Amino acid sequence: MRKFLSLAVMCSLALPAMAFAQPESPKVAADDLEDMPEVEVETTTTEKSVTVEEETTTLVVEGEDGAPDTMVTVVEEKTTVVEEVEETHPFLDGLTWMVMASAFYRIDGYVGEGVRAGEYNTLGYPYTQYNGFGLNFVGGMAQYTGEKFGVTIDLRWGTGASLLTPLVPVKQGYVTYMPNDNISIDFGFFDTIFGGEVADEWANANYTRGALYFLRQPFNHMGIRSAFAFNDKAGFTLMVTNGGVLGGSPIDNNETPTIGWQFALTGEIEAVGFYFGGQHGAGGDNDNKNWENFFDWVLTANAGIFTLVANGDYQISPNGGNNVDGNTDRPFSYGHSLQLIFDASDKFSIGLRGEHLSGNENFRNYVSSGDTGLATATITLRYKPVEYLVLSLEGRGEWNTREIYFARNGPTAMDPDTMEEILLPSQKKNYSAILGFTAFIGN
């Protein structure tokens, strides 16, 4: 969630406060527990076994006044009870943890122009945004859930960390209050509830995240998130956060907070889920009006070995000041994605994804930084040789209406600030191959 198993609520309407996510996987090592305050150890005694033994003793009683001696047999029972003492640690029962690492090798190029090192596009996405070897993320998560409260710490380092969070290495950090079983309230910095993909790629259809994920959706939010479970099939989440509709603002940059919300519905057997929500906030820095509006929907469906995830996003921005041609339409952008996962076996799976992003004329001409008409197609073959290890082979194609991709022998220009020669984008399409290596483990 971030995303797909926003699926925090996605699969079971588990409260997003203590879900995850993402997927969330594994959790903390013994070293992390050494500095924790000493907690009282509870002990319970259980009866393991009972053994009964009989001992027979023969006694001779001398007769009186010439009477004969009498033989007396005495039977004595001995009962032995073997007990087992079990120690329990109630504090540790509420602790979950995860550690992970994700590395890759990426290559693309153009016939006659070779492979260019470094970033391959001008939009700054995805996490695998350059050719060669890379380490997207390495990090982990620790979460403690008590009877009425919880605390979550989620950290990430790596070349992709700065794209994921403005608080590197903090991916998430929040406290949770749970007044009852149906309500949870989070305070702090947390993953978004929107979208059909999450930051942890093993929970997605593909190794790379899509253009919709990067260009049309928030990653995280700073503020308050409240989740309400109406029943086991319907829930509602409400957020009040910093920044604009795309989130990610540790320090507020306008005068009014942003309001976010999401309804979550699941089917009778949870094979189908539908999630619809939005964000509404001031459109500029130090602003309290000109509100932007963002809407997101996700549909999930599962049929045995097949899983389908469809996602759509729409953003209406305040009217820009650059529409010199007299076009007064408010900039409107949109994007859609469709993912299909085929689990051939416990070890092999295939993931497919198709996307299209664009907007109205005012968005394409005055707001967009290059995603004026962007389509992507991705296929991922996955193999899990052992538990918690995922190997991915991925092919990805991208097509744009403008030249946003670099070629090694492309045109150059002089940077007026540094007076250095810089490479200019010269291609409208890009094809790449990616090898992904991911390991994650926890409780």
What are these regions (language model features)?
Residues T88-E119, I185, Y431:
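Transmembrane beta-strand segments of Gram-negative outer membrane beta-barrel proteins
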Residues L95, K148-V151, N182-I185, D232-L238, ...:
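Repeated loop/turn-to-beta-strand initiation elements of outer-membrane beta-barrel proteins
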Residues V99, L135, G140-Y144, Q172-Y177, ...:
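Residues on the lipid-exposed face of transmembrane beta-strands in outer-membrane beta-barrel proteins
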Residues V99-I107, I153-W157, F187-F189, L238-N242, ...:
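Transmembrane beta-barrel strands of outer-membrane/channel proteins
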Residues G109-G132, G160-Q172, Y177-E268, G273-A282, ...:
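Surface-exposed coil loops of outer-membrane beta-barrel proteins
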Residues N131-N136, P166-K171, P218-M222, E255-I259, ...:
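Residues that define the transmembrane beta-barrel architecture of outer-membrane proteins
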Residues N254-T256, W261-A375:
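Detector for outer-membrane/organellar transmembrane beta-barrel domains
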Residues Y383-P385, V390, P425-N443:
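Outer-membrane beta-barrel "beta-signal"
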